[in-house]
């Protein structure tokens, strides 16, 4: 929480003067005093590093880095988007708390981050004011970047408009995320939120990582190729399937295979037809030559019958 912590108790070193007690002015309370021991969510890269004039950048503006270690003025960090790990100077990054509270950047850098590609209308950040230490500014992406000063009352409550005060910055963000209430637009997403990588889906145990998604159709019956080849329509698409599911090379291979098997099947059909003709011809021939023999037998039987009648 960023709500104000209880104020410090009266110091014992205060100097007593007469009946009045004069206390040394307490240092201006920072609303983020409870973040000093809090680990930041991430580091936001403010400039390409190294400079493109020196070498290809390892980290680019707008990237989000996860801190590995603090090396005293340098950070050892890893990019949340590319996974690259390297050192980067502290002046090239800003520490980010709660996703929207930026430390270590000014007005110009805030505008650069909010104007990055894919930044949505309503993206915002809260940053420390450059002109008044201990005060903060709200920067919002609209048609152009708008800046609103966040004032603080003596009781350490915060406000943008005096008619509406908040006990902490989180309450302020929550309110203006629901209604614009005088701002250029409603606060939608924290700055750089669109650069957060989406969680990677765990691969199924039945599929190897990186295996392509395949579409499975009904098993093709190669015995039906001859029947599918009949007719001009079957010759063009013998498989009768959606050609978009097959690559051009695969379709060419299938066409070549079908042309080869088509020649073999046609030869087989011709041989089969020839055999059937020979068989039918021989059958006709045997029936043709059997007719005279039948006549001879019938004639012989008639002669014998005639002789028998004559004898009687």
Curated annotation (Swiss-Prot):
Segments forming domain SH3: 38-98
The subcellular location is: Cytoplasm; Endosome
SMART domains registered for this protein in UniProt? SH2 (SM00252), SH3 (SM00326)
One annotated GO molecular function is:
phosphotyrosine residue binding
Which Gene Ontology cellular-component terms appear in the entry? COP9 signalosome; cytoplasm; endosome; nucleoplasm; plasma membrane
Keywords per UniProt? Cytoplasm, Endosome, Phosphoprotein, SH2 domain, SH3 domain
Superkingdom of the organism of origin: Eukaryota
Query: Where's the SH2 domain?
Result: 100-191
Region Disordered: start and end of each range? 1-33
- Residues where Phosphoserine occurs? 274
Q: Which InterPro entries match?
A: Grb2-like (IPR043539), SH2 (IPR000980), SH2_dom_sf (IPR036860), SH3-like_dom_sf (IPR036028), SH3_domain (IPR001452), SLAP_SH2 (IPR035052), SLAP_SH3 (IPR035596)
GO BP terms: namely:
regulation of MAPK cascade; signal transduction
Statement: the UniProt record of this protein carries the keyword Ribonucleoprotein: no
Q: Which Pfam families match?
A: SH2, SH3_1
Function statement: Adapter protein, which negatively regulates T-cell receptor (TCR) signaling. Inhibits T-cell antigen-receptor induced activation of nuclear factor of activated T-cells. Involved in the negative regulation of positive selection and mitosis of T-cells. May act by linking signaling proteins such as ZAP70 with CBL, leading to a CBL dependent degradation of signaling proteins.
* Family annotation (PANTHER family): PROTEIN ENHANCER OF SEVENLESS 2B
- Domain writeup: The C-terminal domain is essential for the homodimerization and the interaction with CBL. While the interaction with CBL is apparently mediated via the hydrophobic region of this domain, the highly charged region is apparently required for the homodimerization.
Name assigned to this protein: Src-like-adapter
Organism per entry: Rattus norvegicus (Rat)
